[in-house]
Amino acid sequence: MEAYFDNSATTKVLDCVKDAVVDAMCVNYGNAAAKHRKGVEAENLIREAKKAIADTLKVQEKEILFTSGGTESNNTALIGTALANRRAGKHLITTGVEHPSIYNTMSFLEEMGFEVTYLPVDHLGHISLEDLEKAIREDTILVSVMYVNNEVGAVEPIEAISQCIKKKNPKTLFHVDAIQAYGKYKIRPKKQGIDLLSVSGHKIHAPKGVGFLYIRDGVKIRPILFGGGQQKGMRSGTENVPGCVGLGVAAREAYKDFDARIEKLYTLRERLIAGLILLGGVTINGSEDRTNAPQIVSASFEGVRSEVLLHALEDKGVYVSSGSACSSNHPGISGTLKGIGVKKELLDSTIRFSLGDLNVEEEVDYAIGVLGELLPVLRRYQMK
């Protein structure tokens, strides 16, 4: 049996998405910038995909910018707004537990002369609104916060954060990294006061290499890619029509039967947590209840290194992560785990399980059974 619990790293492409992508590659394969019929057909496909995405957020089609994925969306949001608004100020705010595509972009902006404030989080991974309010200044041009933490599943109070920002400085823009939240929460940028929102396709059963950035109409932002002026000059380069089409289909699917899907994920999560706790010597990081995201469980296993456990599980057909897949090729202790106060001896003993729509109860039970067999053996071996 196999059990794939690394859906926060990437997901399997749905059959309906695959069919739409193949059609866009092999039938409607024109360049969307071309003036002939094939080009017009491709352009129409992109427009339909934008509409599908915009409908899930209740925003305008023109506010959706297609990108190559979450990293580009985050880079565009941060660098683009920083450069466009630097006359108003050079101060930005984020948290100490962001994805590398935020953290490293902020580091780049610091090298460019911008000042960045990094807010701490509590033991559950949440920022303090009081800390945020104190950090906002007259020259603060952007606040960037992750909706759902990619390692422990902490959910930030996005609407309350927006209200805090706009009350203290109405001119400050609010960017949300929603890469782990899109498809798991009903996101309404207009209602929640979000100015920019990043999403990645391959987290929701779309192909890799495509994502989007929601940019509220009226936000001052500069492009970071230059060339032929595609997407109204905001993102030059030949449009990835198959990717955009696949993302549009996946976006629609992500919000079909929404309540039932999320209930299923929470039920699986609760079953997994209960099984892990019964194993003994296991600590759940972050919240165990439904204030946490429905798909992520971070667990620390006493006496076992995470990489050893990961490969032992892999040999049994259970696939998990020992950290953010976007940075797992660069060994190091997670800043998120440190930030929420995980004990030093458990920092290198932590595994992330991330559930998806295709998982079933039998897979959870199988994984727990495998862990029950492996842990005593691995602990004895590592204690020698």
Give short role names for the model-derived ranges.
Residues M1-K384:
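Pyridoxal 5′-phosphate
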